[in-house]
């Protein structure tokens, strides 16, 4: 039997309402766009009363969605700022918080003219951070690393799909850069930082890779980076991390332990939900445009210079942390 897109939409909408299934109606539209291979929402509306291209495929995807599988895994796509990435359950779905980190990093890069830099993205997952850096700074050398072979396959796939050239290394330790004599100007990372499993939503536990979310001790990774920063960073450098909301005090002490130069400065920034989420460390730069505290000289100055992304069309981290 043939069904129009309108009929499929109304039937699906009735299904989720009658059975009280937690699926946003807008996702039904997006599934229809995907199945019909339309370019955008306008194309769907124009063809709303036309026959759906593949009702069996729609039903298969819709059933996965009703079972609680994240939409990005169902359609194998996730948007990240201005990029569209392939994702599956071997990698974490890119989050709006990481988009916020990109906004901050690009502001610092532009203000300090770091466009021709060597950039490391550690714990890359889908490659979202490294690929966005390459997309916005085409003359930079970008190296991404991850301990997961499957994640690296996806990062490579996204690199090819986007026609963005990056280098890929398998490791979650700094030694891979030391062995390859790689030093960088910019070091970025969104490592696993959740310690308590009760802090995570069921759909994350069920579908997303736990090694990309959980860690036994969420300070160890950062301490390793701080301890060996002189071996992997050039004299002038930027380091930027996503962190857990409760790490600020502990990381401040670690920074004071390992960064002993007067010209090394750092600050913590909040995400759009008001939680401490970003750590920025700058070495060798005369920074004078945003709130920062130097642990040694104990000076600071203020200027609010960035605004984080609105999140009405973005995917929340699904963590209570």
What are these regions (language model features)?
Residues 33-107:
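Conserved AdoMet
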Residues 1-58:
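A short N-terminal interaction module
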Residues 4, 8, 54, 147, ...:
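Soluble or luminal CAZymes and related metallo-dependent hydrolases
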Residues 287, 291-299, 303-308, 312-319:
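Cationic, amphipathic, low-complexity alpha-helical segments enriched
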Residues 94, 125, 272-275:
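Short glycine/threonine-rich catalytic loop with a Thr-x-Gly-x-Asp
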Residues 100-197, 201, 224:
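Conserved SAM/SAH cofactor-binding pocket of Class I
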Residues 86, 217-282:
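Conserved Class I SAM-dependent methyltransferase catalytic core
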Residues 191-221:
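Mobile active-site "lid"/loop adjacent to the S-adenosyl-L-methionine
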């Amino acid at each position: 039997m043939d069904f129009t897109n309108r009929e499929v939409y109304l039937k699906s909408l009735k299904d989720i309402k009658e059975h009280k299934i937690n699926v946003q109606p807008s996702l039904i539209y997006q599934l229809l766009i995907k199945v019909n291979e339309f370019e955008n929402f306008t194309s769907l509306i124009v063809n709303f009363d036309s026959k759906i291209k593949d009702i069996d495929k729609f039903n298969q995807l819709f059933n996965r969605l009703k079972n609680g599988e994240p939409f990005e895994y169902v359609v194998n796509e996730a948007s990240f700022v201005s990029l569209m990435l392939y994702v599956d359950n071997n990698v974490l779905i890119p989050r709006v918080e990481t988009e916020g980190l990109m906004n901050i990093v690009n502001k610092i890069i532009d203000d300090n003219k770091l466009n021709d830099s060597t950039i490391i993205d550690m714990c890359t997952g889908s490659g979202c951070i490294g690929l966005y850096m390459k997309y916005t700074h085409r003359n930079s050398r970008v190296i991404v690393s991850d301990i997961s072979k499957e994640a690296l396959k996806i990062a490579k796939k996204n690199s090819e799909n986007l026609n963005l050239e990056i280098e890929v290394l398998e490791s979650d330790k700094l030694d891979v850069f030391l062995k390859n004599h790689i030093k960088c100007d910019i070091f970025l990372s969104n490592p696993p930082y959740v310690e308590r499993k009760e802090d995570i939503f069921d759909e994350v536990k069920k579908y997303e890779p736990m090694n990309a979310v959980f860690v036994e001790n969420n300070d160890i990774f950062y301490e390793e980076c701080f301890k060996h920063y002189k071996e992997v960073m050039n004299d002038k450098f930027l380091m930027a991390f996503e962190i857990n909301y409760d790490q600020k005090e502990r990381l401040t002490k670690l920074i004071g332990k390992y960064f002993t130069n007067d010209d090394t400065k750092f600050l913590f920034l909040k995400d759009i939900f008001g939680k401490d989420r970003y750590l920025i460390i700058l070495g060798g730069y005369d920074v004078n445009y945003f709130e920062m505290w130097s642990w040694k000289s104990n000076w600071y100055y203020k200027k609010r210079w960035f605004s984080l992304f609105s999140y009405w069309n973005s995917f929340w981290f699904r963590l209570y942390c």
